[in-house]
Amino acid sequence: MKNFLAHHLKEKTFRRSKIDFAMNTYNLTDRCPVEVFKKDIPEGKLVEYLMSSAYLPFFKFEKIIDNKYYIDGGVYSDCPVDMLIDAGYDEIYVIKAFKKRIRYKHKKGIKIHIIGPRENLGSIMSFTQEGAKFKMKLGYYDTLKYLYNLDGNKYYFKNYSEEYYTKLFDKRVYKKIIKEYDKGILPKTDKEFILRTIEKICKEFKIERFRIYKLPYLLTRLKNKITNNKESKYYYFIKNIKIEFE
């Protein structure tokens, strides 16, 4: 891991960046937490500090920084928001990789945005490249969903009004649609029902999940696909839905 990081990390580029960096770790030798910002990391020690911040000695326990033992900072603070508050940041976005609640100081004038995963991310012992890429994409798109108020549960749709969705079906046809496809929990709105059904169709046709979709263009794509899949249980839904451009 050390050789991998040393090969791929460009410390000069890291230090020239105007974006600050903060991390925490735990010094097992001295039995104390360590919190550092970019300026606190000694020259030439970036790789060691990064390794210490995520070190879990399941297979091998070795000294990392200055001949001392370190372990993942999560053993004392799995989301070190307080160090950012103490540094003077007044608006903080927290992207969690876990579902449990985080604890931090509540100070007047400090705004904390919490963005958590909507699904189980699996064990921290899962080190596959495929799994890591999935988690990064999920975190990125869930953040976009939060920032831009996107619609969708598993997928990401541009936000359209409730009124927009009421125009997508003729009233007579819509009654049949509801009866045919609303087999689960009753939706609160037409928008909720239609989006829920569209997501099921996207899953059936293996539509790429990590992308922001404008509904008219997505529906056009689904209509093209459904013409060759008349046996699909969603054929009647897609056939009758209208494509409404803003």
PLM regions and their residue ranges:
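Patatin-like phospholipase
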Residues: 1-246
